[in-house]
Swiss-Prot record:
Family affiliation: Belongs to the NAPRTase family.
Name of protein: Nicotinate phosphoribosyltransferase
One GO MF term attached to the UniProt entry: nicotinate phosphoribosyltransferase activity
Record keywords, A-Z: Ligase, Phosphoprotein, Pyridine nucleotide biosynthesis
Pfam families named in the record: NAPRTase (PF04095), NAPRTase_N (PF17767)
Catalyzed reactions: nicotinate + 5-phospho-alpha-D-ribose 1-diphosphate + ATP + H2O = nicotinate beta-D-ribonucleotide + ADP + phosphate + diphosphate
Involved pathway(s): Cofactor biosynthesis; NAD(+) biosynthesis; nicotinate D-ribonucleotide from nicotinate: step 1/1
Chain positions found as Phosphohistidine: H242
EC assignment: 6.3.4.21
A GO cellular component annotation in the UniProt record: cytosol
Length: 434
Protein backbone atom coordinates (compact mmCIF):
# COMPACT_ATOMS: atom_id res chain seq x y z
CA UNK A 1 0.00 0.00 0.00
CA UNK A 2 1.49 3.41 -0.93
CA UNK A 3 2.42 5.58 2.02
CA UNK A 4 0.37 8.70 2.66
CA UNK A 5 1.86 12.03 3.72
CA UNK A 6 -0.67 12.54 6.51
CA UNK A 7 0.38 16.12 7.28
CA UNK A 8 0.04 17.20 3.65
CA UNK A 9 -3.27 15.34 3.35
CA UNK A 10 -4.65 17.12 6.44
CA UNK A 11 -3.56 20.52 5.12
CA UNK A 12 -4.98 20.06 1.62
CA UNK A 13 -8.67 20.30 2.51
CA UNK A 14 -9.71 22.07 -0.68
CA UNK A 15 -12.60 19.75 -1.57
CA UNK A 16 -16.22 20.26 -0.57
CA UNK A 17 -16.43 17.07 1.48
CA UNK A 18 -13.58 14.88 2.67
CA UNK A 19 -15.45 11.75 3.80
CA UNK A 20 -14.31 10.30 7.10
CA UNK A 21 -16.09 6.97 6.72
CA UNK A 22 -15.68 5.65 3.18
CA UNK A 23 -16.72 2.04 3.71
CA UNK A 24 -19.22 0.18 5.87
CA UNK A 25 -16.32 -2.18 6.66
CA UNK A 26 -14.70 0.72 8.51
CA UNK A 27 -16.16 -0.68 11.71
CA UNK A 28 -15.22 -3.12 14.46
CA UNK A 29 -15.42 -6.82 13.64
CA UNK A 30 -17.55 -7.60 16.68
CA UNK A 31 -20.30 -5.41 15.25
CA UNK A 32 -20.63 -7.80 12.29
CA UNK A 33 -20.51 -10.87 14.52
CA UNK A 34 -23.17 -9.40 16.82
CA UNK A 35 -25.18 -8.18 13.82
CA UNK A 36 -25.56 -11.70 12.47
CA UNK A 37 -26.84 -12.88 15.86
CA UNK A 38 -29.22 -9.93 16.19
CA UNK A 39 -30.49 -10.40 12.62
CA UNK A 40 -31.08 -14.11 13.21
CA UNK A 41 -32.42 -14.18 16.79
CA UNK A 42 -33.80 -10.68 17.45
CA UNK A 43 -35.13 -9.47 14.08
CA UNK A 44 -38.15 -7.62 15.50
CA UNK A 45 -36.46 -5.86 18.42
CA UNK A 46 -36.20 -2.08 18.29
CA UNK A 47 -33.13 -0.49 19.87
CA UNK A 48 -32.22 3.16 20.36
CA UNK A 49 -28.56 4.19 20.48
CA UNK A 50 -27.51 7.52 22.00
CA UNK A 51 -24.29 9.50 22.00
CA UNK A 52 -22.83 10.06 25.49
CA UNK A 53 -19.93 12.46 26.09
CA UNK A 54 -18.53 11.55 29.50
CA UNK A 55 -15.94 14.34 29.28
CA UNK A 56 -18.40 17.06 30.25
CA UNK A 57 -15.77 19.82 30.20
CA UNK A 58 -15.50 19.42 26.42
CA UNK A 59 -18.43 21.11 24.66
CA UNK A 60 -18.53 19.17 21.42
CA UNK A 61 -21.17 21.38 19.79
CA UNK A 62 -18.87 24.38 20.29
CA UNK A 63 -15.87 22.60 18.73
CA UNK A 64 -17.52 20.81 15.79
CA UNK A 65 -19.55 22.52 13.08
CA UNK A 66 -23.05 21.02 13.04
CA UNK A 67 -23.40 21.15 9.26
CA UNK A 68 -20.07 19.37 8.81
CA UNK A 69 -21.30 16.67 11.17
CA UNK A 70 -24.56 16.33 9.24
CA UNK A 71 -22.67 16.13 5.94
CA UNK A 72 -20.49 13.29 7.26
CA UNK A 73 -23.43 11.38 8.72
CA UNK A 74 -25.36 11.80 5.46
CA UNK A 75 -22.39 10.53 3.48
CA UNK A 76 -22.16 7.44 5.69
CA UNK A 77 -25.87 6.80 5.10
CA UNK A 78 -25.19 6.64 1.38
CA UNK A 79 -22.67 3.82 1.69
CA UNK A 80 -23.29 0.20 0.76
CA UNK A 81 -21.08 -2.86 1.08
CA UNK A 82 -19.19 -3.23 -2.19
CA UNK A 83 -18.98 -6.41 -4.26
CA UNK A 84 -15.32 -6.79 -3.30
CA UNK A 85 -16.16 -6.47 0.39
CA UNK A 86 -18.97 -9.01 0.18
CA UNK A 87 -16.72 -11.52 -1.60
CA UNK A 88 -14.10 -11.07 1.13
CA UNK A 89 -16.63 -11.54 3.95
CA UNK A 90 -17.99 -14.67 2.27
CA UNK A 91 -14.67 -16.25 1.37
CA UNK A 92 -12.26 -15.25 4.13
CA UNK A 93 -11.62 -17.35 7.22
CA UNK A 94 -12.14 -15.75 10.64
CA UNK A 95 -10.86 -17.33 13.83
CA UNK A 96 -10.00 -20.43 11.83
CA UNK A 97 -13.52 -20.79 10.42
CA UNK A 98 -14.64 -20.39 6.84
CA UNK A 99 -18.17 -19.21 6.05
CA UNK A 100 -18.66 -17.77 9.52
CA UNK A 101 -21.37 -15.59 7.98
CA UNK A 102 -24.33 -17.45 6.50
CA UNK A 103 -25.30 -16.89 2.84
CA UNK A 104 -28.72 -15.64 3.96
CA UNK A 105 -27.18 -13.07 6.28
CA UNK A 106 -24.76 -11.90 3.60
CA UNK A 107 -27.61 -11.51 1.11
CA UNK A 108 -29.37 -9.24 3.62
CA UNK A 109 -26.13 -7.39 4.39
CA UNK A 110 -25.53 -6.64 0.70
CA UNK A 111 -28.65 -4.46 0.76
CA UNK A 112 -27.88 -2.83 4.11
CA UNK A 113 -27.77 0.92 4.63
CA UNK A 114 -27.49 2.93 7.82
CA UNK A 115 -30.87 4.20 9.08
CA UNK A 116 -31.82 7.82 9.72
CA UNK A 117 -30.45 9.80 12.65
CA UNK A 118 -31.71 12.58 14.93
CA UNK A 119 -29.32 15.43 15.71
CA UNK A 120 -29.77 18.49 17.90
CA UNK A 121 -27.75 20.71 20.24
CA UNK A 122 -28.21 21.21 23.96
CA UNK A 123 -25.97 23.01 26.47
CA UNK A 124 -22.92 22.83 24.22
CA UNK A 125 -23.35 19.13 23.46
CA UNK A 126 -24.75 17.21 20.52
CA UNK A 127 -27.74 14.99 21.11
CA UNK A 128 -27.30 12.28 18.48
CA UNK A 129 -29.81 9.44 18.47
CA UNK A 130 -30.48 6.43 16.25
CA UNK A 131 -33.91 4.75 16.45
CA UNK A 132 -35.24 1.69 14.68
CA UNK A 133 -34.65 -2.02 14.36
CA UNK A 134 -31.73 -3.23 16.46
CA UNK A 135 -30.22 -4.92 13.39
CA UNK A 136 -29.96 -1.49 11.76
CA UNK A 137 -29.22 0.99 14.55
CA UNK A 138 -26.41 -1.10 16.01
CA UNK A 139 -24.27 -0.39 12.95
CA UNK A 140 -24.21 3.37 13.66
CA UNK A 141 -22.13 3.08 16.83
CA UNK A 142 -18.64 2.86 15.34
CA UNK A 143 -18.97 5.24 12.34
CA UNK A 144 -20.75 7.87 14.46
CA UNK A 145 -17.95 7.87 17.04
CA UNK A 146 -15.22 7.84 14.39
CA UNK A 147 -16.85 10.78 12.59
CA UNK A 148 -17.17 12.90 15.73
CA UNK A 149 -13.63 12.20 16.89
CA UNK A 150 -12.08 12.97 13.51
CA UNK A 151 -14.14 16.15 13.05
CA UNK A 152 -12.87 17.27 16.45
CA UNK A 153 -9.28 16.54 15.39
CA UNK A 154 -9.76 18.43 12.13
CA UNK A 155 -11.22 21.43 13.97
CA UNK A 156 -8.27 21.46 16.37
CA UNK A 157 -5.77 21.47 13.49
CA UNK A 158 -7.64 23.84 11.18
CA UNK A 159 -5.36 26.81 11.82
CA UNK A 160 -2.08 24.91 11.54
CA UNK A 161 0.20 25.41 8.56
CA UNK A 162 1.90 22.59 6.63
CA UNK A 163 5.22 22.88 8.51
CA UNK A 164 3.54 22.78 11.94
CA UNK A 165 1.45 19.80 10.86
CA UNK A 166 4.59 18.05 9.65
CA UNK A 167 6.20 18.55 13.06
CA UNK A 168 3.04 17.37 14.82
CA UNK A 169 2.87 14.09 12.92
CA UNK A 170 6.63 13.53 13.05
CA UNK A 171 6.51 13.76 16.84
CA UNK A 172 3.42 11.54 17.04
CA UNK A 173 5.13 8.92 14.87
CA UNK A 174 8.26 9.03 17.03
CA UNK A 175 6.13 8.69 20.16
CA UNK A 176 4.27 5.73 18.71
CA UNK A 177 7.47 4.06 17.54
CA UNK A 178 9.02 4.36 21.01
CA UNK A 179 6.05 2.34 22.29
CA UNK A 180 6.66 -0.26 19.59
CA UNK A 181 10.27 -0.54 20.73
CA UNK A 182 9.14 -1.18 24.32
CA UNK A 183 6.79 -3.93 23.14
CA UNK A 184 9.62 -5.56 21.18
CA UNK A 185 11.30 -6.39 24.48
CA UNK A 186 8.48 -8.87 25.18
CA UNK A 187 8.31 -11.08 22.07
CA UNK A 188 5.66 -13.44 23.51
CA UNK A 189 3.22 -10.60 24.21
CA UNK A 190 0.20 -10.63 21.88
CA UNK A 191 -1.48 -7.36 21.00
CA UNK A 192 -4.14 -6.17 18.57
CA UNK A 193 -5.56 -2.83 17.43
CA UNK A 194 -8.84 -1.89 19.16
CA UNK A 195 -8.60 1.81 18.32
CA UNK A 196 -11.34 2.55 15.76
CA UNK A 197 -14.00 4.25 17.90
CA UNK A 198 -11.92 7.09 19.33
CA UNK A 199 -9.14 7.35 16.78
CA UNK A 200 -7.53 10.64 15.75
CA UNK A 201 -8.33 9.84 12.12
CA UNK A 202 -8.65 6.90 9.76
CA UNK A 203 -5.29 7.66 8.14
CA UNK A 204 -3.60 7.80 11.53
CA UNK A 205 -5.12 4.50 12.62
CA UNK A 206 -3.90 2.97 9.37
CA UNK A 207 -0.38 4.24 10.04
CA UNK A 208 -0.45 2.84 13.59
CA UNK A 209 -1.57 -0.55 12.28
CA UNK A 210 1.21 -0.53 9.68
CA UNK A 211 3.73 0.45 12.38
CA UNK A 212 2.70 -2.45 14.61
CA UNK A 213 2.80 -4.89 11.70
CA UNK A 214 6.28 -3.70 10.77
CA UNK A 215 7.57 -3.26 14.31
CA UNK A 216 6.48 -6.34 16.27
CA UNK A 217 5.65 -8.82 13.51
CA UNK A 218 3.81 -11.91 14.68
CA UNK A 219 3.22 -10.39 18.13
CA UNK A 220 0.70 -8.13 16.38
CA UNK A 221 -2.31 -10.40 16.07
CA UNK A 222 -4.68 -8.21 14.06
CA UNK A 223 -7.09 -5.30 14.03
CA UNK A 224 -10.68 -4.93 15.16
CA UNK A 225 -11.16 -2.64 12.15
CA UNK A 226 -12.51 -4.85 9.38
CA UNK A 227 -11.45 -2.58 6.52
CA UNK A 228 -7.87 -2.30 7.79
CA UNK A 229 -7.75 -6.05 8.37
CA UNK A 230 -8.85 -6.68 4.79
CA UNK A 231 -6.51 -4.10 3.25
CA UNK A 232 -3.46 -5.17 5.30
CA UNK A 233 -4.01 -8.95 5.19
CA UNK A 234 -4.52 -9.09 8.96
CA UNK A 235 -6.80 -11.07 11.21
CA UNK A 236 -10.06 -9.27 11.96
CA UNK A 237 -10.40 -9.60 15.74
CA UNK A 238 -13.22 -9.08 18.23
CA UNK A 239 -15.95 -10.99 20.01
CA UNK A 240 -18.99 -9.31 21.59
CA UNK A 241 -19.98 -6.16 23.48
CA UNK A 242 -22.15 -4.90 26.33
CA UNK A 243 -25.12 -4.17 24.10
CA UNK A 244 -26.08 -7.86 24.04
CA UNK A 245 -26.74 -8.27 27.80
CA UNK A 246 -28.04 -4.69 28.00
CA UNK A 247 -30.78 -5.36 25.45
CA UNK A 248 -31.50 -8.83 26.81
CA UNK A 249 -31.97 -7.38 30.30
CA UNK A 250 -34.16 -4.53 29.06
CA UNK A 251 -36.50 -7.03 27.40
CA UNK A 252 -37.06 -9.10 30.56
CA UNK A 253 -40.46 -9.19 32.24
CA UNK A 254 -39.55 -10.26 35.78
CA UNK A 255 -36.65 -10.74 38.19
CA UNK A 256 -36.10 -14.35 37.21
CA UNK A 257 -35.60 -13.38 33.57
CA UNK A 258 -33.41 -10.43 34.56
CA UNK A 259 -31.10 -12.69 36.58
CA UNK A 260 -30.82 -15.09 33.63
CA UNK A 261 -30.30 -12.41 30.94
CA UNK A 262 -26.46 -12.19 31.05
CA UNK A 263 -26.22 -15.96 30.52
CA UNK A 264 -29.02 -16.23 27.96
CA UNK A 265 -27.10 -14.04 25.51
CA UNK A 266 -24.06 -16.29 25.95
CA UNK A 267 -26.22 -19.27 25.02
CA UNK A 268 -27.50 -17.32 22.02
CA UNK A 269 -23.91 -16.56 21.04
CA UNK A 270 -22.94 -20.19 21.35
CA UNK A 271 -25.64 -21.11 18.80
CA UNK A 272 -23.62 -19.30 16.15
CA UNK A 273 -20.01 -19.29 17.25
CA UNK A 274 -17.49 -21.41 19.14
CA UNK A 275 -13.79 -21.86 19.89
CA UNK A 276 -11.85 -18.63 20.30
CA UNK A 277 -15.04 -16.61 19.89
CA UNK A 278 -16.33 -17.98 23.21
CA UNK A 279 -15.10 -14.99 25.19
CA UNK A 280 -17.13 -13.76 28.17
CA UNK A 281 -17.59 -10.03 28.78
CA UNK A 282 -18.67 -10.20 32.44
CA UNK A 283 -19.03 -6.63 33.68
CA UNK A 284 -22.25 -5.28 32.13
CA UNK A 285 -23.94 -5.53 35.54
CA UNK A 286 -20.79 -6.06 37.61
CA UNK A 287 -18.26 -8.88 37.37
CA UNK A 288 -18.82 -10.04 40.96
CA UNK A 289 -22.54 -10.55 40.33
CA UNK A 290 -21.83 -12.33 37.04
CA UNK A 291 -19.35 -14.77 38.61
CA UNK A 292 -21.53 -15.32 41.67
CA UNK A 293 -24.46 -16.65 39.64
CA UNK A 294 -22.70 -18.05 36.55
CA UNK A 295 -23.67 -21.60 35.51
CA UNK A 296 -20.89 -24.17 35.44
CA UNK A 297 -20.76 -24.23 31.64
CA UNK A 298 -19.49 -20.62 31.56
CA UNK A 299 -16.19 -21.90 32.98
CA UNK A 300 -15.75 -24.05 29.88
CA UNK A 301 -15.63 -21.03 27.58
CA UNK A 302 -12.27 -20.07 26.09
CA UNK A 303 -11.74 -16.93 28.15
CA UNK A 304 -12.87 -13.62 29.59
CA UNK A 305 -12.45 -9.97 28.66
CA UNK A 306 -12.31 -7.95 31.93
CA UNK A 307 -13.23 -4.51 30.64
CA UNK A 308 -13.74 -2.00 33.46
CA UNK A 309 -11.89 -3.20 36.56
CA UNK A 310 -8.16 -2.41 36.93
CA UNK A 311 -6.55 -5.08 34.72
CA UNK A 312 -4.46 -6.89 37.33
CA UNK A 313 -7.23 -6.83 39.92
CA UNK A 314 -9.85 -7.92 37.40
CA UNK A 315 -7.65 -10.69 36.02
CA UNK A 316 -6.90 -12.07 39.48
CA UNK A 317 -10.61 -12.35 40.29
CA UNK A 318 -11.31 -14.32 37.13
CA UNK A 319 -8.33 -16.63 37.71
CA UNK A 320 -9.55 -17.26 41.27
CA UNK A 321 -13.01 -18.07 39.89
CA UNK A 322 -11.62 -20.51 37.33
CA UNK A 323 -9.72 -22.30 40.10
CA UNK A 324 -12.85 -22.40 42.25
CA UNK A 325 -14.70 -23.96 39.32
CA UNK A 326 -11.96 -26.59 38.91
CA UNK A 327 -10.47 -25.21 35.68
CA UNK A 328 -6.78 -24.67 34.95
CA UNK A 329 -6.18 -20.94 34.24
CA UNK A 330 -3.12 -21.82 32.16
CA UNK A 331 -5.49 -23.25 29.56
CA UNK A 332 -7.67 -20.12 29.57
CA UNK A 333 -7.41 -16.73 27.89
CA UNK A 334 -7.70 -13.22 29.34
CA UNK A 335 -8.19 -10.34 26.89
CA UNK A 336 -7.40 -6.97 28.44
CA UNK A 337 -8.77 -3.91 26.65
CA UNK A 338 -9.80 -1.08 28.98
CA UNK A 339 -7.87 2.20 28.61
CA UNK A 340 -4.54 0.48 28.13
CA UNK A 341 -1.25 2.07 27.20
CA UNK A 342 2.11 0.44 26.71
CA UNK A 343 3.17 0.69 30.37
CA UNK A 344 -0.07 -0.89 31.61
CA UNK A 345 0.15 -3.58 28.95
CA UNK A 346 3.70 -4.57 29.88
CA UNK A 347 3.04 -4.43 33.64
CA UNK A 348 -0.06 -6.61 33.28
CA UNK A 349 1.72 -9.05 30.97
CA UNK A 350 4.65 -9.47 33.36
CA UNK A 351 2.29 -9.95 36.31
CA UNK A 352 0.35 -12.83 34.70
CA UNK A 353 3.07 -14.39 32.51
CA UNK A 354 3.03 -18.18 32.81
CA UNK A 355 -0.25 -18.23 34.77
CA UNK A 356 -2.77 -17.63 31.99
CA UNK A 357 -2.83 -17.01 28.25
CA UNK A 358 -3.17 -13.32 27.45
CA UNK A 359 -4.01 -10.94 24.65
CA UNK A 360 -4.24 -7.15 24.72
CA UNK A 361 -6.62 -4.91 22.80
CA UNK A 362 -4.92 -1.52 22.47
CA UNK A 363 -7.41 1.25 21.81
CA UNK A 364 -7.47 5.01 22.20
CA UNK A 365 -3.92 5.30 23.54
CA UNK A 366 -2.74 3.61 20.35
CA UNK A 367 -4.70 5.60 17.79
CA UNK A 368 -5.19 8.97 19.51
CA UNK A 369 -2.15 9.84 21.63
CA UNK A 370 -0.96 13.28 20.52
CA UNK A 371 -0.14 14.64 23.99
CA UNK A 372 2.98 16.80 23.78
CA UNK A 373 3.26 16.48 19.99
CA UNK A 374 2.00 19.93 18.93
CA UNK A 375 4.46 22.86 19.11
CA UNK A 376 1.97 24.52 21.46
CA UNK A 377 -0.69 22.72 23.49
CA UNK A 378 -3.94 22.09 21.60
CA UNK A 379 -6.70 20.82 23.89
CA UNK A 380 -8.75 19.62 20.94
CA UNK A 381 -6.13 16.95 20.24
CA UNK A 382 -6.60 15.34 23.65
CA UNK A 383 -8.85 12.25 23.51
CA UNK A 384 -12.19 12.34 25.28
CA UNK A 385 -14.38 9.63 26.76
CA UNK A 386 -17.24 9.41 24.29
CA UNK A 387 -19.48 6.40 23.70
CA UNK A 388 -22.59 5.48 21.73
CA UNK A 389 -24.65 3.12 23.87
CA UNK A 390 -27.98 1.40 23.53
CA UNK A 391 -30.40 3.44 25.63
CA UNK A 392 -33.72 1.69 24.94
CA UNK A 393 -34.94 -1.68 23.72
CA UNK A 394 -38.55 -1.97 22.61
CA UNK A 395 -39.21 1.29 24.44
CA UNK A 396 -37.76 0.08 27.74
CA UNK A 397 -34.64 1.68 29.27
CA UNK A 398 -31.33 -0.16 28.84
CA UNK A 399 -28.69 -0.04 31.57
CA UNK A 400 -24.99 -0.73 31.90
CA UNK A 401 -23.42 -0.76 35.38
CA UNK A 402 -19.79 -1.90 34.79
CA UNK A 403 -17.21 -2.38 37.56
CA UNK A 404 -16.49 1.34 37.50
CA UNK A 405 -19.51 3.40 38.64
CA UNK A 406 -18.35 6.32 36.48
CA UNK A 407 -19.02 4.21 33.38
CA UNK A 408 -22.63 3.43 34.27
CA UNK A 409 -25.18 4.45 31.64
CA UNK A 410 -28.96 4.53 31.57
CA UNK A 411 -31.96 6.14 33.19
CA UNK A 412 -30.92 7.01 36.80
CA UNK A 413 -33.96 5.32 38.36
CA UNK A 414 -33.34 2.19 36.31
CA UNK A 415 -29.62 2.22 37.19
CA UNK A 416 -30.61 2.31 40.86
CA UNK A 417 -32.98 -0.64 40.34
CA UNK A 418 -30.23 -2.68 38.69
CA UNK A 419 -27.80 -1.81 41.50
CA UNK A 420 -30.27 -3.08 44.09
CA UNK A 421 -30.86 -6.25 42.07
CA UNK A 422 -27.29 -7.16 41.06
CA UNK A 423 -25.42 -5.41 43.88
CA UNK A 424 -22.29 -3.27 43.69
CA UNK A 425 -19.76 -5.68 45.18
CA UNK A 426 -16.14 -4.93 44.23
CA UNK A 427 -17.03 -1.80 42.25
CA UNK A 428 -14.00 0.50 42.03
CA UNK A 429 -14.49 4.13 41.06
CA UNK A 430 -11.76 5.28 38.67
CA UNK A 431 -11.40 8.37 36.55
CA UNK A 432 -12.45 7.79 32.94
CA UNK A 433 -10.03 9.46 30.54
CA UNK A 434 -10.87 7.48 27.40
Amino acid sequence: MPKTDIARRVYNHTWKLDPIVRSLLDTDFYKLLMLQMIWQLYPDVDATFSLINRTKTVRLADEIDEQELRDQLDHARGLRFTKKEMIWLAGNSFYGRTQIFSPEFLAWLARFRLPEYELSRRDGQFELTFRGRWAETTMWEIPALAIINELRSRAAMKGLGPFTLDVLYARAKAKMWSKVEQLREHPNLRISDFGTRRRHSFLWQRWCVEALKEGIGSSFTGSSNVLLAMDNDLEAVGTNAHELPMVAAALTRNDRELAAAPYKVLQDWNQLYGGNLLIVLPDAFGTAAFLRDAPDWVADWTGFRPDSAPPIEGGEKIIAWWKKMGRDPREKLLIFSDGLDVDTIIRTYCHFEGRVRMSFGWGTNLTNDFAGCAPTEINGLNPISIVCKVSEANGRPAVKLSDNPRKATGDPAEVERYLKFFGSEDFVEQSVRV
